[in-house]
From Swiss-Prot:
Annotated binding of Zn(2+), by residue: 244, 311-312
Name recorded for this polypeptide: Homocysteine S-methyltransferase 3
Catalytic activity: S-methyl-L-methionine + L-homocysteine = 2 L-methionine + H(+)
Subunit structure, as described in the record: Monomer.
InterPro entries associated with the record: Betaine-hCys_S-MeTrfase_BHMT, HCY_dom, HCY_dom_sf, Hcy_S-methyltransferase
Pfam families: S-methyl_trans (PF02574)
Lineage of the species this protein comes from: Eukaryota, Viridiplantae, Streptophyta, Embryophyta, Tracheophyta
Cofactor: Zn(2+)
Known role: Catalyzes methyl transfer from S-methylmethionine (SMM) to adenosyl-L-homocysteine (AdoMet). SMM degradation (by HMT-1, HMT-2, HMT-3 and HMT-4) and biosynthesis (by MMT1) constitute the SMM cycle in plants, which is probably required to achieve short term control of AdoMet level.
Chain ranges of the Hcy-binding domain: 12-326
EC code(s) of this entry: 2.1.1.10
GO BP, sorted A to Z: methionine biosynthetic process; methylation
Amino acid sequence: MVGTAEGGAERAVRRWVDAAGGRLVLDGGLATELEANGADLNDPLWSAKCLLSSPHLIRKVHMDYLEAGANIIITASYQATIQGFESKGFSKEQSENLLTKSVQIALEAREMFLKEHLEKSTPIQHPILVAAALGSYGAYLADGSEYSGDYGEAGTKEFLKDFHRRRLQVLAEAGPDLIAFETIPNKLEAQAYVELLEECNINIPSWLSFNSKDGVHVVSGDSLIECATIADKCAKVGAVGINCTPPRFIHGLILSIRKVTDKPILIYPNSGERYDGEKKEWVESTGVSDGDFVSYVNEWCKDGAALIGGCCRTTPNTIRAIHRTLNQGCHKHQLPVA
């Protein structure tokens, strides 16, 4: 386990970035790929439903992203919570075991991928990492509030800490390389996360990733700069960034984050399609093609992004194109030095 005392989390992420040649490639959308492989995700558990019904599909999607060039695969735990599983009739122990299973599946996929390439005499020389995903409280509610940050009466820091505490501990104990706090919609939840990292003494690097719908603020209306500052001040946070946000906003968001932190910046936008929180569906024909998506990559590199991938509605083809673009020269852009 990588220590995170005195900036160790940031150093760990930078070592991985350097070992990959200057940039790390994240994977892409999980839920849409599971659906493309036949999974039925019409459930509040969303992709976490497959931990119960079809773990083999999760493993396959992880493998598809690794074959496409991803250095980091993110577990199917974004919407997996103890409270959510208990609402389905599972005991606390069973719920915790399902969280652990999400990490185990990703670790198995990595082992299979490395073994296959070793047997082909094409051993993998770059880092292959597993990030355990923690979605926001709004993701558990499955009512679209992860895209608004409006939690109503539940919107207190202590409530959020109590909600996430055991989930964070279980995922960290399962053995991932990183903890990924994803799609953070407001400043309050970011503060809850960094306090939990300290209180629970989580000794593996984490990242905090926010979402924006206007290119200036996080979706709640809170200042992105203030949110990034919270992440910057926590030694257990190794990277700060943006996910589930249209590609056209990323340039300005990276520049805003760089004003307040020297930590590595990660970005994994969605396809640009608009999500209808009431209907719980993506609005067709509102996004960009893989070609248009990848056309932004060189700009993001110049801006200083160190970890680049995709979020909702991106596919292994998107990640393959990002990987190809990075190999064609994006690495030559110098990263900011801490």
